[in-house]
């Protein structure tokens, strides 16, 4: 018996679900070159426009000159350098928590935290729309795994009644495909009432949300008691790469001892930590970035509603336009690209069947004029698609 990979690939093509990697031939930013074509992009997660910031680039360059290029070893051997330590202290300060721990990727942070905290005989409860890394972590933990209805504290409470052992409730802060936010106060109340812990992956909230860019937990004014485990990524609003878990002294020490994705991997380049420290400095000093981004979000939503587009409930930089049919979403993405604008079509299995969408993401690096160009192109494309015979 052999693996029939060709048949699997053919089936995916037939369902309009086949994915290909665009080749980026320029730095990240609103104006990019993809597969040789200049495009105005609305599909990256560089929410504050820091990925190509000259000061961040210089911090990386000078960090490489001082500390070299590679991490060289795992953190527990000889890979934990002074820049790593300084970044962990800065992230602890940003989150208002005693400690923070660096991970190489967001996927590894989620996998490491969940599997270190729960196992056989325990329970992990997750929002049904959580990121794949969180769902995988729950499944791989060995704990009893169950999902509650999306953003539904009542559904969570019913499942908490049946939980056994140490119980970890896990949710995204901002849901990456819908752009809506978790009702953290309600989830925290339900979780705390049953003596469970709440873990929040705020990958898309850090930077854009909160009074100081501290994310959704800061937005709601929640502390360590309500959210004992807080995860963030550095490759989105901070414009670099990596991730972290923030929490109590005991939590971080436990992760150092028991989180296998932390223990058994080489540390990130020290120069990368230098660059991220500069990003954090810019987050504190350049408040206009968050203010400008908020204005662009308002501009886009008002314009999209005037066109009659079906938006989702989001006040974040993630602004999905619900299309429904996968082939139609791909067609709209292609039509936009023909007009020099890049917006990704998101299809199953990333989103539920029948809910394909265009996923617009906005950045502080965009201008009001660029957002208006996007709105005009969307109006033209939707009007043109409706006039085509197959969609009339």
UniProtKB/Swiss-Prot annotation:
Key words, A-Z: Biotin biosynthesis, Pyridoxal phosphate, Transferase
Q: Name one GO molecular function term.
A: 8-amino-7-oxononanoate synthase activity
For the keyword Transferase, the answer is yes
Q: Which residues carry this modification: N6-(pyridoxal phosphate)lysine?
A: 236
Stated family = Belongs to the class-II pyridoxal-phosphate-dependent aminotransferase family. BioF subfamily.
Question: What's its job?
Answer: Catalyzes the decarboxylative condensation of pimeloyl-[acyl-carrier protein] and L-alanine to produce 8-amino-7-oxononanoate (AON), [acyl-carrier protein], and carbon dioxide.
Organism listed in the record: Pseudomonas fluorescens (strain ATCC BAA-477 / NRRL B-23932 / Pf-5)
* Catalysed reaction, written as an equation: 6-carboxyhexanoyl-[ACP] + L-alanine + H(+) = (8S)-8-amino-7-oxononanoate + holo-[ACP] + CO2
User: Could you say which enzyme class this protein belongs to?
Assistant: transferase
Domain of life here? Bacteria
> Under what name is this protein listed?
8-amino-7-oxononanoate synthase
Q: Where does substrate bind?
A: 19, 131, 350
């Amino acid at each position: 018996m052999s693996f029939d990979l060709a048949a699997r690939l053919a089936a995916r093509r037939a369902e309009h679900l086949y994915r290909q990697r665009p080749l980026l031939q320029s730095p990240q930013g609103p104006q990019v070159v993809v597969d040789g074509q200049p495009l105005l992009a609305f599909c990256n997660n560089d929410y504050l426009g820091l990925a190509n910031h000259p000061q961040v680039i210089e911090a990386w360059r000078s960090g490489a000159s001082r500390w070299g290029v590679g991490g060289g070893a795992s953190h527990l051997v000889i890979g934990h350098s002074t820049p790593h330590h300084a970044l962990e202290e800065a992230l602890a300060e940003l989150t208002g928590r005693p400690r923070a721990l660096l991970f190489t990727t967001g996927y590894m942070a989620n996998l490491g935290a969940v599997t270190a905290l729960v196992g056989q005989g325990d329970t992990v409860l997750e929002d049904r729309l959580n990121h794949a890394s969180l769902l995988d972590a729950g499944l791989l933990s060995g704990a009893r795994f169950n999902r509650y209805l999306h953003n539904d504290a009542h559904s969570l409470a019913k499942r908490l009644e049946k939980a056994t052992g140490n119980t970890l409730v896990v949710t995204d802060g901002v849901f990456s495909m819908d752009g809506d936010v978790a009702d953290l106060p309600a989830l925290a109340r339900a979780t705390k009432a049953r003596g469970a812990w709440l873990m929040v992956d705020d990958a898309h909230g850090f930077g854009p949300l909160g009074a100081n860019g501290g994310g959704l937990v800061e937005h709601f004014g929640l502390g360590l008691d309500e959210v004992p485990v807080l995860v963030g990524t550095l490759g989105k609003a901070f414009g670099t790469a990596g991730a972290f878990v923030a929490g109590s002294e005991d939590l971080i020490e436990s992760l150092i001892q028991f989180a296998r994705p932390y223990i058994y991997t080489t540390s990130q380049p020290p120069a990368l930590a230098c660059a991220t420290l500069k990003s954090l400095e810019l987050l504190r000093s350049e408040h206009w970035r968050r203010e400008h981004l908020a204005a662009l979000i308002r501009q886009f939503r008002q314009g999209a509603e005037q066109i009659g587009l079906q938006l989702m409930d989001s006040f974040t930089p993630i602004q999905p336009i619900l299309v429904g049919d996968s082939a139609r979403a791909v067609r709209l993405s292609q039509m936009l690209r023909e007009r020099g604008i890049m917006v990704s079509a998101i299809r199953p299995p990333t989103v539920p069947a029948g809910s394909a969408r265009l996923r617009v993401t906005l950045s502080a690096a965009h201008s009001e004029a660029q957002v208006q160009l996007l709105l005009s192109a969307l109006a033209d494309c939707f009007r043109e698609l409706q006039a085509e015979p197959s969609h009339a």
